[in-house]
Amino acid sequence: MSRPDSAVSLLPDYSLRAHNTFGFDARARVAARIGSPGQFASLARDPRVAGLDRLVLGGGSNVVFTRDFDGLVLLDEIRSRALVREDDGAWYVEAGGGENWHAFVEWTLAEGMPGLENLALIPGTVGAAPIQNIGAYGLEMKEHFASLRAVDLATGELVEFDAARCAFGYRDSFFKRDGRGRFAIVAVTFRLPKAWTPRIGYADVARELAARGIDARAARARDVFDAVVAIRRAKLPDPLALGNAGSFFKNPVIDAQAFAALRAREPDIVSYPQPDGRVKLAAGWLIDRCGWKGRALGAAAVHERQALVLVNLGGASGADVLALAHAIRRDVLGRFGVELEMEPVCL
């Protein structure tokens, strides 16, 4: 007889090395592979794991383990993708929380539904995308977000979230604040407008298109996708070859007065004006100016081509990476008066 959909096998003393892109060999007291929302719900009532802290892991691309996790790690393996409806203005596509983000983006293009191409090759899963409100090359996920479904880990209840309830911000959402650790995102629906125009405001994208002989004004979604993939592969290390979590720091946003004072001291500072009058600074530029690009502290290092990326050279611990991050933050604050915020969750 087959096991019921909600039945879950528990994996004691489980290695998380293959479940975090830094490759840290942290261990979970117990883990469970989750293939359906019902399995998340059943564990909320399971006496075998009563009272244990819970951590949902997708691709592990936004986490730094500084120690073993003395609780239950839920490995989200809910994989699905489908066009769930369409109207005259848009397609609505849904993907499971454990679906690989890049593969999902590529699928939408293959199905003739553009819009997410600027977010190509961002590591992680679909379920992690709203938590971080991922963004790159002039596009944030929230711009195409429609809704999501999540399981309340305490009660097992399935809850629907719209954009307002998610409270998206810059690399931020409800799930990083009041909702942190409380929900498992099992499905996300995106609205992809049929009236598509390329997002090519970033100079890197325009340059890559030009290098390929493509007029930016005539670029197709696949052209933008290919350009973004090429840029990211040139700048960012492959986690399978060199452990990392992508961009480790957020680009800081400061008010106009603080920026004017900073630019008076640093005329060539890289910056991006924001609609609200504030100014976003390039964290990588700040780190590079402090002399950190390519430097190492033990087996943890700043990547030689992209100062935003911290890497595990082999044998580094989460504590080593965190020590490097703190040293960088201290130097940037001391030189520029700007505080860098780390993107990954440190446990």
From Swiss-Prot:
Any one biological process term the GO annotation gives: peptidoglycan biosynthetic process
Pathway this chain belongs to: Cell wall biogenesis; peptidoglycan biosynthesis
A UniProt-annotated Pfam family: MurB_C
This protein's UniProt keywords: Cell cycle, Cell division, Cell shape, Cell wall biogenesis/degradation, Cytoplasm, FAD, Flavoprotein, NADP, Oxidoreductase, Peptidoglycan synthesis
Domain of life: Bacteria
EC number(s) per entry: 1.3.1.98
Location (main, coarse): cytoplasm
Localisation: Cytoplasm
Catalytically driven reaction(s): UDP-N-acetyl-alpha-D-muramate + NADP(+) = UDP-N-acetyl-3-O-(1-carboxyvinyl)-alpha-D-glucosamine + NADPH + H(+)
Gene3D superfamilies: 3.30.465.10, UDP-N-acetylenolpyruvoylglucosamine reductase, C-terminal domain, Uridine Diphospho-n-acetylenolpyruvylglucosamine Reductase, domain 2
Protein family membership: Belongs to the MurB family.
Role played: Cell wall formation.
Protein name: UDP-N-acetylenolpyruvoylglucosamine reductase
Organism of this sequence: Burkholderia pseudomallei (strain 668)
Designated gene of the protein: murB
